[in-house]
Each structure stands twice: as structure tokens, then as C-alpha cells.
Amino acid sequence: MKSNKRNNRKLRIALGICIPLALIIAATLTVVAKYGPDFGLYLVPPSAERYGKDALATIGKNGIYSGSDEWKSTYEECLKMIENAESYEDTYPAIKKALSVCGGKHSILMTKSESQSTSDSYDEVLPTVSLNGDIAVIKLPDFLGTAEAGRKYAKVAEDFIHENRDKINGVVLDLRGNTGGDMGPMATAVSSLLPDGELMYYHYRSYDVPVTLKDGVISNAGTGGKSPYPDEKLKVPVAILTDGMTASSGEALTLCFRGLENVKTFGAPTAGYTSVNMLYSLYDGAQMYLTVAFDKARTGEIFKETSIEPDVATDSPLEAALEWLRS
């Protein structure tokens, strides 16, 4: 009798464990089934049509132009384009069309091989720094790399400013050719030139998200970053150089300085990719870069994929910047 009671007790304990576990598994499967397609996750491989429809749904839910009349008609066209799709690749034309209309010119689709090729071909380029008399010249290139590479990138400019802080009476920040990438290391590199607070904003359809600097920590900018010199602020004039290749995060960094005293831009209008992309991975490894927000300056100006005009348009921006800084 005692043996039966012990067995019954063990059975009740086992069932008590199994039932909550089953509920957890069921809940997990429900979540994956509902939200997984947004991240390329499925319980079973999707059909080509399902794959395409889910991609279009993600674009329509998050794209910056999803409320436009053009998108409404384009969405129906894209659905028809994937009706007879036999492979995931067959849906790519419809996805690309949807991205261009609902996401704008900054949005793209990259196949798995294209994404891998881009990653493999990226050459790490570090900032270059120098002193021109009492003027610091800092050139920040585009950046796309690991967190460790980002810290290495930022450290070049951070250490240079720290070591020469008593000599520097002005800064040239050269963003020409900076096509973007991860803004975190870029902003961290020059955080000593920026005041703590909200630097710029990502302007979504119904709300804003600020890029912030506090105690040396950059937040909401790519991978972010933390300066080893949070208390050091170099309050000197800053001249920013831009050209037609200054794009995306390069433009966002330019806007971090917009509206500040003793800041002036020189050169040519930027590329006009003043928007924020979100990465969505698809089931087959393809990646959608979808524009979900515009850049907004602390001045309240919203840049809807428009160029940032320089304060001084010139073919000799470095010379003009040095002249201004020394005047």
C-alpha cells in the first residue's frame, strides 16, 4: 500500500512538471508561429508564396511609406507577382518592388550570397588624425564591423583628442566619403566634441527615438559605445566637411552637430540617405534592409531622405574650414 502511495505521489509530481512544460512549449510554438516570420523563423519550411507574403507583410507593417496610396496599390501588385512562385528566388522581384515603394531609395534586398560577399569584402579602415598647428583634423571613414573593431575605431580619435586636448583650439571633422554603417563607433569617437543629452532623433511614423550621449555612453546609435574619457569636453569650434558620398550614418553624425554653437559645415550637399534602416532576415538567408524612420535634427528639422546642404558650398572645403577656424 505504501509503495502504491509513493508511486502515485511520484506520478503526480511528474505530471505537475510535464503540464507546465507542455504549456511553455505550446506558448513558445505559438509565439514563433505568430512573430517568427518577422525574423525569418518558421516551425516548418514555408512555401515560396508564404515566404513572399510574409516578407510583404513585414514591409507593409514597418516601412516608412506604408501609409501612402502608392503602397496600397503596389502591395496588391506584389501579391499577384508571387502567386505562382515556385522558389524563394521567384519572389525577389516582388520583394524588391515592395521595398522601393514602401521603404524608399535606402531600402534594399540582399541575397544570402550578396550579404556574405559584402561582409567578406569589407576592409577595415581606421580614422586618421593629425594636427595642423592648433587645429585637429579628424577623418572618420564609414564603419561596418564587430564590437571589438568598433572600439578600436573609436579609440583612435578618442586617444588623439585626449592626448592633445591642451593644444587643440579647433577641429576639422572630415566626413567626406563616409557612406555610413554603424554610427555607434563614429559618434563615440567624437563624443568629447558633443554635449551630453539628445543628439538627434529617429523620426518614426508616430514617435521619435533620440540618440543620446550621457556620461560618455552613446545609446540608440547602432552598437553604441562608451568613451574612456566621459568627463572631458573640448569646447572649441568644429568645422564639418561633407560631400556627395557622405551618406546614411555619415549624415546622421553630421546632424548630431546641427544646431550647436560654433559649428559650421563646408563642402557639398550630402547623398540624401537621411533615414534609418532596420534589418530583417528571411528564411533562406536573404536580408531586407527596410527604411523605418527619417533623421531629425535637434533643431526640429526632419530630413526625409533629402541632402544636408553645407553652410559653405566650396570645392576647397578643408582650406575654407581652416580659414574659418583661424579667423
Residues of each region from the PLM?
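N-terminal Sec-pathway targeting helices
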Residues: S3-T30
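Membrane-interface motif at the C-terminal end of an N-terminal transmembrane signal
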Residues: I24-L43
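Terminal peptide-recognition signature
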Residues: A55, A98, I138, L173, ...
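Extended, small/polar residue-biased N-terminal targeting/export presequences
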Residues: Y65-G133, S327
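STAS-typified acidic loop motif
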Residues: P127-Y153
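Short acidic catalytic loops
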Residues: I138-K139, F160, N164-G180, I240-L241
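Gly/Ser/Thr-rich loop/hinge elements
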Residues: G180-P237, S275-S281, G285, V292-R298, ...
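Low-complexity, Gly/Ser/Thr/Pro-rich intrinsically disordered linker/tail segments
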Residues: E301-K304, I308-S327
